[in-house]
Regions:
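A short N-terminal helical cap/helix-turn-helix that marks the beginning
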Residues: 1-2, 92
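Short, Lys/Arg-enriched alpha-helical recognition elements, typified by the DNA-recognition helix
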Residues: 3-84
Length: 171
């Protein structure tokens, strides 16, 4: 029974505060990015979400170059919000089953050539800023940006020239 209907955005705002106490900060950051950048612009004003709308959303994201994995992760967040709203009595929810095309080609990422990498690294060295330093460390070590952002001085052994990666953060 639905009483006091709410929009998906209203439900998501309440869900975020409830969910925050049960998940790590980095997990919550991923949920919030998914909501703000993808889900709420499409579903935020709606009082219910149909299978047809979710299917159209998934295909649109796929056509814009997102991977099935990324889209499935977004749909997990949407499902958590919708189920939360249903549990609170703010909306009715009928389970959806989203289908993805069977022969979706894998997206290929462009890779820097050695010459382009050297040119970029020279630029970063000649134009020092802390963000440029982070990019330079990524290019030089193969670390991910979240690993570089989480580095502490204690992770760097100047005697041996070793860098110890002990944590990561979500930007």
């Amino acid at each position: 029974m639905v009483n006091n209907k709410k929009t998906i955005k209203e439900i998501a705002d309440i869900w975020k505060e409830d969910k925050r106490q049960y998940v790590k900060q980095s997990t919550m950051a991923v949920y919030l990015l998914s909501l703000e950048n993808h889900l709420l612009p499409v579903f935020g004003g709606k009082m219910e979400v149909t299978e047809e709308e979710v299917q159209a959303f998934a295909l649109d994201k796929l056509n814009h170059g997102l991977s099935q994995k990324s889209i499935k992760d977004m749909l997990i967040v949407l499902k958590m919000v919708v189920r939360f709203g249903e549990k609170q009595g703010w909306l009715n929810h009928v389970e959806w089953k989203v289908k993805f095309p069977a022969n979706q080609p894998k997206a290929t990422l462009p890779i820097l050539t050695k010459a382009h990498q050297k040119k970029l690294m020279d630029y970063l060295k000649d134009n020092f800023t802390f963000p440029n330093l982070g990019i330079l460390v990524c290019l030089s070590t193969g670390l991910r940006i979240g690993e570089v952002c989480a580095l502490k001085w204690s992770d760097i052994n100047m005697d041996t020239g070793l860098l110890h990666v002990n944590r990561t953060i979500e930007r």
